[in-house]
Amino acid sequence: MCIRDSSFLVQDQQGQRFEAILKSFDRNSLLFTPQKPVAIPPASSLRIEILQALPKQKALDFILQKTTELGVSRLDVFCGMHSPKTFRASEKQHHLKRWQRIVSEASKQCGRQFAPEIHFHPDISAALETLPECPNSWVLVPEEADAVSWKKISSSGDDIIKHHRVLIGPEGGFHQDEIKLSLRSGMHPVYLGPRILRSETAAMSAVSILQFLWGDL
């Protein structure tokens, strides 16, 4: 419930935030008076990019919202070979607008000045060809063999890594051809433990771990 003369925060299209006083409201509008500007929390010094195979809509909404809150810089969505559904090229703009609205709302809720970038690709091959080079690129794999450990890398004493890209599969996991293609493109396999994670859990866990080891958590 809105209470007249109560204060709240507003954010404009340039990302500036202000304290405001509510004067009146009805079903379709609010009238408020801007007061003093409010400091914006600094952006994360760690650039994290998520390359996400398309999961179910509810799971993707969760991924977009929570990774935005955790400070992800860019989200690239593609139709995976095991994705539960795909959509036609003509539907691309409709979905992008919806996704952009979700990350915009999440950014305002958590105090971010700007929302992350969002892009869509028809398949993993197109995504890998389009993305700029990132030496610290990872693909989440279900088995520990040949996989690297972020914890071991972070404790090795090497320079602080400030740019990561993580490839995450849908609910059905990756097709073997997708894993092979990602490894040929220069990605490194990484293992998040013995438990089977949902796609949305894997995305949120990966971003949280990276922020804890190299970012601002």
Where are these regions (language model features)?
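Structured adenosyl-cofactor binding patch, chiefly the S-adenosyl-L-methionine
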Residues: Q176-L217
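Active-site/ligand-binding-proximal alpha/beta "capping" segment
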Residues: C134-G173, D177-I179, M187-V190
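Conserved small/polar residues in nucleotide/adenosyl-binding loops
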Residues: M1-S6
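Short, ordered loop/turn segments at secondary-structure junctions
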Residues: Q13, P37, C79-H82, P194
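RNA substrate-binding interface of SAM-dependent RNA methyltransferases
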Residues: P41-W138
